[in-house]
Amino acid sequence: MEQWKCNICGYIYNPETGDPEGDIPAGTSFESLPDSWMCPVCGAGKEEFTKI
């Protein structure tokens, strides 16, 4: 699975681990994240992420 990097703070979203603090289970692809999901570090929206 592809990882995505926040352009604001550098946080890496890894689908293999998900976002436990945001109740996003492991195995959730970036594309499957709800539109309301935000970076857990800086609060940026999905539009601020770039595939790496």
Curated annotation (Swiss-Prot):
Q: What function does the entry list?
A: Serves as an electron acceptor for pyruvate ferredoxin oxidoreductase (PFOR).
* An example Gene Ontology molecular-function term: iron ion binding
Question: Rubredoxin-like domain location, by residue?
Answer: 1-52
Annotated positions binding Fe cation: 6, 9, 39, 42
Annotated PANTHER family: RUBREDOXIN, RUBREDOXIN-1-RELATED
What interactions and quaternary structure are annotated? Monomer.
* Gene3D superfamilies linked: 2.20.28.10
- UniProt family annotation: Belongs to the rubredoxin family.
Q: Which UniProt keywords apply?
A: Electron transport, Iron, Metal-binding, Transport
* Name of the protein this chain belongs to: Rubredoxin-2
Q: Which GO terms describe its biological process?
A: alkane catabolic process
* InterPro entries (UniProt xref): Rubredoxin (IPR024922), Rubredoxin-like_dom (IPR024934), Rubredoxin_dom (IPR024935), Rubredoxin_ET (IPR050526), Rubredoxin_Fe_BS (IPR018527)
Name of the coding gene: rub2
What binding details are noted for the cofactor? Answer: Binds 1 Fe(3+) ion per subunit.
What are the required cofactors? Fe(3+)
